[in-house]
Amino acid sequence: MGSTSTPASSTNRLQDKVAIITGGAGGIGETTAKLFVRYGAKVVIADISDDHGQKVCNNIGSPDVISFVHCDVTKDEDVRNLVDTTIAKHGKLDIMFGNVGVLSTTPYSILEAGNEDFKRVMDINVYGAFLVAKHAARVMIPAKKGSIVFTASISSFTAGEGVSHVYTATKHAVLGLTTSLCTELGQHGIRVNCVSPYVVASPLLTDVFGVDSSRVEELAHQAANLKGILLRAEDVADAVAYLAGDESKYVSGLNLVIDGGYTRTNPAFPTALKHGLA
């Protein structure tokens, strides 16, 4: 329903930048890796899925341009190794895209939500974001520059029935972490931002809910405020590229919402008005 054409003048916007993308073996992470390489960056993707991660690298470019490192973001030693391996290979780190995130697999109701599932989602979504920021800062502070971008969600500042309590809590936490890190790391020339997309038909959603991407897109479009266009992973990748690169050199602490105005509207109001006037 929409296009994601790239202006010719911006094709080198990340030239000579070095980026790490966690959760890079699929979905938004994979799409962002493709875009970063197209824009001239050297990319290291990290994931727990070795086969998928290596396949993504092979499909995108040569090993000197894009490479894979196994990384569980909940393990300090894995994240440390990820950053150290990137520095050893490329000599620096300009961009950290903390993109790993998972959904709850237990019922929405607080009475039925699983305790261990809550801990698992919190560990990956929040502690994982903390660790990637910590180890990125470890090498960015001496360099006095860098850009850290997180994938949050419209659930970072809203809530809705059917969206698990733990997922909403973790995305609120990622937004809080973004704001807090912006305050400290700005003193070292490091920018920290996040993106909050509306529904994207990624494997994260389709796998958990057991539906295909076309069904996810159909439901998302029905509920969307902005009609006639679907939000794609490419649109989120474009936003991440903006925050990662020099075009946003004085932008920090921003939660870039990519939702077509969804969170600015009250969908119950026009429905109630329509029924009231009928």
From Swiss-Prot:
<feature type="binding site">
    <location>
        <position position="200"/>
    </location>
    <ligand>
        <name>NAD(+)</name>
    </ligand>
</feature>
<feature type="binding site">
    <location>
        <position position="171"/>
    </location>
    <ligand>
        <name>NAD(+)</name>
    </ligand>
</feature>
<feature type="binding site">
    <location>
        <position position="104"/>
    </location>
    <ligand>
        <name>substrate</name>
    </ligand>
</feature>
<dbReference type="Pfam" id="PF13561">
    <property type="entry name" value="adh_short_C2"/>
</dbReference>
<feature type="active site" description="Proton donor/acceptor">
    <location>
        <position position="167"/>
    </location>
</feature>
<feature type="binding site">
    <location>
        <position position="99"/>
    </location>
    <ligand>
        <name>NAD(+)</name>
    </ligand>
</feature>
<dbReference type="GO" id="GO:0009807">
    <property type="term" value="P:lignan biosynthetic process"/>
</dbReference>
<dbReference type="InterPro" id="IPR020904">
    <property type="entry name" value="Sc_DH/Rdtase_CS"/>
</dbReference>
<dbReference type="InterPro" id="IPR036291">
    <property type="entry name" value="NAD(P)-bd_dom_sf"/>
</dbReference>
<dbReference type="InterPro" id="IPR002347">
    <property type="entry name" value="SDR_fam"/>
</dbReference>
<keyword id="KW-0520">NAD</keyword>
<feature type="binding site">
    <location>
        <position position="47"/>
    </location>
    <ligand>
        <name>NAD(+)</name>
    </ligand>
</feature>
<dbReference type="GO" id="GO:0120529">
    <property type="term" value="F:secoisolariciresinol dehydrogenase activity"/>
</dbReference>
<dbReference type="GO" id="GO:0009611">
    <property type="term" value="P:response to wounding"/>
</dbReference>
<dbReference type="GO" id="GO:0009753">
    <property type="term" value="P:response to jasmonic acid"/>
</dbReference>
<dbReference type="InterPro" id="IPR045309">
    <property type="entry name" value="ABA2-like"/>
</dbReference>
<comment type="subunit">
    <text>Homotetramer.</text>
</comment>
<dbReference type="GO" id="GO:0009411">
    <property type="term" value="P:response to UV"/>
</dbReference>
<feature type="binding site">
    <location>
        <begin position="23"/>
        <end position="28"/>
    </location>
    <ligand>
        <name>NAD(+)</name>
    </ligand>
</feature>
<feature type="binding site">
    <location>
        <position position="73"/>
    </location>
    <ligand>
        <name>NAD(+)</name>
    </ligand>
</feature>
<keyword id="KW-0560">Oxidoreductase</keyword>
<feature type="binding site">
    <location>
        <position position="164"/>
    </location>
    <ligand>
        <name>substrate</name>
    </ligand>
</feature>
<protein>
    <recommendedName>
        <fullName>Secoisolariciresinol dehydrogenase</fullName>
        <ecNumber>1.1.1.331</ecNumber>
    </recommendedName>
</protein>
<comment type="pathway">
    <text>Aromatic compound metabolism; phenylpropanoid biosynthesis.</text>
</comment>
<comment type="function">
    <text>Oxidoreductase involved in lignan biosynthesis. Also involved in the biosynthesis of etoposide, a chemotherapeutic compound of the topoisomerase inhibitor family. Catalyzes the stereospecific conversion of (-)-secoisolariciresinol to (-)-matairesinol via a lactol intermediate.</text>
</comment>
<dbReference type="GO" id="GO:0009699">
    <property type="term" value="P:phenylpropanoid biosynthetic process"/>
</dbReference>
<comment type="similarity">
    <text>Belongs to the short-chain dehydrogenases/reductases (SDR) family.</text>
</comment>
